[in-house]
């Protein structure tokens, strides 16, 4: 009885190793993640703890990426949270959370979506926890941010950029 479809017996080793031991297969990995900047402001404490009205919450975020070395990139996820009521600002939390990503043999058309969609998706739960803890440590109930569809936002911005490029007449860029 032959196991022709068995993963152990069908390793596709016919091609052999790449000359000189070169590894040409694409690889992406998270090297490290860290808080680059964290600011918590509680400008109206302790009076703000007595405010009865529900505050308005504003959450803004931004994503940036830069090459540190040819195969290492830094993704920076900035999240700013402001809680305001009629009586003033309760708290402001500003976080810059980063990840170092190792990328080897990844084409640019695949690296860009990873750096601006998948990478932030990986980092977000950790940033979310830091913000919840910072708000709690400021004396308020922990703030649990809603999940963000980074892939959907990336695709939306890509479509907008393509539409803008198509609307701009040639020679007027």
Curated annotation (Swiss-Prot):
GO CC terms of this entry: cytoplasm
Molecular function terms, GO-annotated: unfolded protein binding
Top-level taxon in the UniProt lineage: Bacteria
InterPro entries noted in UniProt: SecB (IPR003708), SecB-like_sf (IPR035958)
Keywords, comma-separated and alphabetical: Chaperone, Cytoplasm, Protein transport, Translocation, Transport
GO terms (BP aspect): protein folding; protein tetramerization; protein transport
Record's subcellular location: Cytoplasm
Alphabetized HAMAP family for the sequence: SecB
Subunit structure: Homotetramer, a dimer of dimers. One homotetramer interacts with 1 SecA dimer.
Role according to the record: One of the proteins required for the normal export of preproteins out of the cell cytoplasm. It is a molecular chaperone that binds to a subset of precursor proteins, maintaining them in a translocation-competent state. It also specifically binds to its receptor SecA.
Similarity remark: Belongs to the SecB family.
PANTHER family: PROTEIN-EXPORT PROTEIN SECB, PTHR36918
Protein name as catalogued: Protein-export protein SecB
Organism, as annotated: Novosphingobium aromaticivorans (strain ATCC 700278 / DSM 12444 / CCUG 56034 / CIP 105152 / NBRC 16084 / F199)
Name of encoding gene: secB
